[in-house]
UniProtKB/Swiss-Prot annotation:
Catalytically driven reaction(s): 4 Fe(2+) + O2 + 4 H(+) = 4 Fe(3+) + 2 H2O; Fe(2+)(in) = Fe(2+)(out)
Positions that bind heme b: M52
Listed PROSITE patterns: BACTERIOFERRITIN, FERRITIN_LIKE
Positions bound to Fe cation 1: E18, E51, H54, E127
GO terms, molecular function: ferric iron binding; ferroxidase activity; heme binding; iron ion binding
Domain Ferritin-like diiron: 1-145
Matches recorded under InterPro entries: Bacterioferritin, Ferritin-like, Ferritin-like_diiron, Ferritin-like_SF, Ferritin_DPS_dom
Function: Iron-storage protein, whose ferroxidase center binds Fe(2+), oxidizes it using dioxygen to Fe(3+), and participates in the subsequent Fe(3+) oxide mineral core formation within the central cavity of the BFR protein shell.
Protein name: Bacterioferritin
Source species of the chain: Streptomyces coelicolor (strain ATCC BAA-471 / A3(2) / M145)
UniProt record similarity statement: Belongs to the bacterioferritin family.
Cofactor binding notes: Binds 1 heme b (iron(II)-protoporphyrin IX) group per dimer.
Species lineage: Bacteria, Bacillati, Actinomycetota, Actinomycetes, Kitasatosporales
Required cofactor names: heme b
């Protein structure tokens, strides 16, 4: 099915954003895990996987419209060093995505591609949920301070008795 070139470009632009977010969130999850913020790392890793699902849906839609998914470009990956910087960087990605998705929905509806608009609306709902989470975490950091906040995202685990060195 031949799709509109402008719609396909919006789909590809959002695909680029999702591929970038996958990398950024996955790296942040690894940094968080390395720093011992294991509960936070699990959440961030899950967000990376959510972005992967978005990329899959966008890829399928682009292919259905006889377009070529562009996996060769990425936007700038913003890497935070502190938890606050990570949340701020991730918030920027989400704000940009929300703006792009809203613009895309308008174009898709104007071109009568309701299915692509529905795909963007579903992704938009997920991104709005994620930005709400990020803003809540940033508010908590502002109220509690970064050190106290971090004490809430550490998960103490017991050593695995069947781990290395066991028989």
């Amino acid at each position: 099915m031949q799709g509109d070139p402008e719609v396909i470009e919006f789909l590809n632009e959002q695909l680029t954003a999702e591929l970038t977010a996958i990398n950024q969130y996955f790296l942040h999850a690894k940094l968080q895990d390395h720093k011992g913020w294991t509960k936070l790392a699990k959440y961030t890793r899950a967000e990376s996987f959510d972005e992967m699902r978005h990329a899959e849906v966008l890829t399928d839609r682009i292919l259905l419209l006889d377009g070529l998914p562009n996996y060769q470009r990425l936007f700038h990956v913003r890497v935070g060093q502190s938890v606050t910087e990570m949340f701020q960087a991730d918030r920027e990605v989400e704000l940009e995505a929300i703006d792009r998705l809203r613009r895309g929905i308008e174009v898709m509806r104007a071109k009568h591609d309701i299915t692509s608009a529905n795909v963007f609306e579903a992704i938009l709902a997920d991104e709005e949920h994620h930005i709400d989470y990020l803003e809540t975490q940033l508010d908590l950091i502002e109220k509690l301070g970064e050190s106290l906040y971090l004490s809430t995202v550490i998960e103490q685990t017991q050593p695995d008795p069947s781990g290395p060195g066991s028989l």
